[in-house]
């Protein structure tokens, strides 16, 4: 059955003169088409995820292709049951992805070797290869390639320092890296080359492309792919589904992400509906008793109900 909506994921490193003005006009164009989504514009290019009807997304792709700067842009297309976003944002930023480098990497001049899904899969099976996930830790925890290294980072900009601290582990190995759609790896793989890594490859088109390849069919991917829209999780492996996510509270298999109820914390964590209720939607006791706990407010729990749940939880944890 054909779905009514689509989600488009894309990026393009290309010089954009006066990116701020471009972003303002692009927002107007997107709103005129009725699209929803989030697009970042920088002088170095564009990176976006938008959703809308088939007609709206087709019109957007035509709009982009009619601009000489974006004729080679590759759109990764997912069918969807509804819009993946509630609003339309186009924002200007100094750079598309932030590695916090004093001397930034220009992917148009320096980047790792592009590997298509089949080449990437074959390279992963080589015992002299290490695979580094270029995403954040919470993305990795939902799903990742078999044997991939999980950098202990909360954001992409922390990755270079983590590599410097751990480079002896894989300096002499062939290094592969991957991310959701490919944009982060363009810069990260180029930085690895600049740092002296001899053999660096990147998954061209990212995990999103790997999962749609008719031959590879997402093989060697465990879990689901984290996405930055209302879907949160997208299946990748067409051959088998292995759950790698673990519930924050009890370690059981889980693929349901929530944010900690304490708005000052907002930690993303995997949790079942049952555990979310049991732990009042919060990652710790301090967050559970926070006066602005969103879970308590959303469920209109009385102070008595909160105290009863806390008492039961304390008893359970003590046993």
From Swiss-Prot:
Pfam families: Rhodanese, Rhodanese_C, UPF0176_N. It comes from the Bacteria. This is tRNA uridine(34) hydroxylase. Its EC number is 1.14.-.-. NCBIfam families: PRK00142.1-3 (NF001135). It comes from Lactococcus lactis subsp. cremoris (strain SK11). CDD domains: RHOD_YceA (cd01518). GO terms for biological process: tRNA modification.
